[in-house]
Every structure is written in C-alpha cells, then in structure tokens.
Amino acid sequence: MSVTTADASRSIADQLPADVRITHHTGADIIADPHPWARAYEEVYSHAIDLADHCDPPITERLTRHATRPGFSLVAAHAGDTLAGYLYGYTLPTDSLWWEGLTPDPGPDFVREHPGRTVGLCELLVTRPYRRTRIALALHAAFLAHRTEERAAALIADGNDVMLDRYAKYGFHKVGTVEPYPGWRRHTMVVGPLR
C-alpha cells in the first residue's frame, strides 16, 4: 500500500509537541484580520525588518494582496493560543511574473504557466520558541497535502542555507536566482514536483 501525502502529513503531525495543532485558513480569513500573521512575521524577522526584503512592500500589504489570489491557502501551527508558525501560497496564474528575471533562464517551457501547473510558496516561518520542533516540516506537509498542482516553487533569501538544505530534503532543486521585488536581495528559486 502506498503512503499518500495526506498520510505523511498526519504522521508528521503526530510527532509534534502535544499542544501544537495545525489549522487551515482561506484568503477571506486572512483579509478579515491580517494582523496576527503580520505580527508573527515581524517577530521572526525583527533582526532584519529594515531590509527591503521585509518591509517593501509591507507584509500586511503582501498578505492581503496574495490572499485574494486563486488557490490561496495558509496553514498555521498554534501552540495553545500562540501562533507558532505558518506557511502560505497560491496557484500561479498564467500571466504570472514569478519567473521574471530568473537567471539562468530555464527556457520558455519551464516558465510557461497553465492552469494548475505551479503553486508558489510565499512564506514559511516558525517563531523562535518553536524552532527545531518539526513545525516547519509539518506546515510544509500539511500545505502540500491537498494541493492539486503539478509542482511547487519557493524563493529562499540569499545566505539562508538552512532553508536551502531543508527544501532539498523536501525534494526541491535549485533552478536559478531572482530579485523578487526591486531592491530585495537575490533569492534562490527552488522547484519540486507534486505529482
């Protein structure tokens, strides 16, 4: 019998601390109150919040804009009433700018989107007290468990070797580098198959 992504997600969730629960949220949930999510982001990146990567455009603006995109989903980990981390993303549209400026250019067949081809993973974060508790792995598995896209793509800030290694363990491979927004550091684009 094969193990499904949903089965793997349940297995990982079973290994989390007893008080941690995983919850799923829609775009409407985030738009209704983006502040808890923005506060967690600002806490995680407090050491670098003045870098363009983290403040331009502001996280609240990015969250609410992304929450309106088709296929948006946010998966969160809560320890009791405390937000311990989250991952969110959405389905890339056919006119996506996600791949714009990617070097080296992987070619038109790679970057051409069609409905349901790619889910973009926009943000994965875990607050400091809950790191090294498998929450990131659980969020990743829970987010991807119900996705129907062919592949997933994520951007990892230059110098974040921990996340590059983690995504490699998730089955993602590097395809190039890109500046996601004007003035941001270079980010490594990683892509992994979902089917």
Model-derived segments and spans:
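Conserved active-site alpha-helix within GNAT-family acetyltransferase domains
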Residues: 137-138, 151, 158-185
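Conserved acetyl-CoA-binding loop-helix of GNAT-fold acetyltransferases
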Residues: 121-126, 132-145, 168-169
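Short hydrophobic/aromatic beta-strand element in the GNAT-like acyltransferase core
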Residues: 71-76, 86, 118, 123, ...
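A short helix-loop-beta-strand connector motif used in the catalytic cores of GNAT acetyltransferases and
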Residues: 64-76, 92-97, 120
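Conserved donor-binding loop and adjoining core beta-sheet/short helix segment
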Residues: 78-96, 194
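Short amphipathic alpha-helix that is part of the acyltransferase structural core
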Residues: 3-61, 74-83
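Conserved acyl-donor/pantetheine-binding loop and adjacent beta-alpha core of acyl/acetyltransferases
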Residues: 88-123, 182
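Conserved GNAT acetyl-CoA-binding A-motif
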Residues: 119, 145-159
